[in-house]
């Protein structure tokens, strides 16, 4: 899908198992996002390379609406939901932490039965796209090995948005932390991880 990138910023990304979402939904969301990106790019062209604040805000509101739409469909639990199994989740957990500290700063994630939410900050020259590819490749290799399968495990596309400010960051952290509960999952069906810094901030916050 079309993506906006800014060096040194945090991103909220969602990637999913290949059988978790109907192809027509993916194509519809892709077309909507592309139309919006063209609109913002044209606004930037007209305004000396930078879209006006209201256009940029509208684009980000659209992204959040897309994420909500995506989440509603994914939480229906379509497909085999391989990540419901602890050993498959552990393969993904290992992959998510493999590059922590040298390719990305991992801030939070929720592993759901058929999809994953990640909040992270790519480091140096590493891109979110390269991180997504690595996480998928490493976890797929291990899960396929356990199942004796081959072929595509993950959908190639991901859905992501740029974290725009501290308020947005806090809302994403809360969303990730509460996602399994919101989806009415049992503790054994999902996994949530928050950076120790976030955990400490949560403990220090007034109740």
Residues of each region from the PLM?
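Short catalytic/metal-binding and nucleic-acid-binding patches
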Residues: 1-207
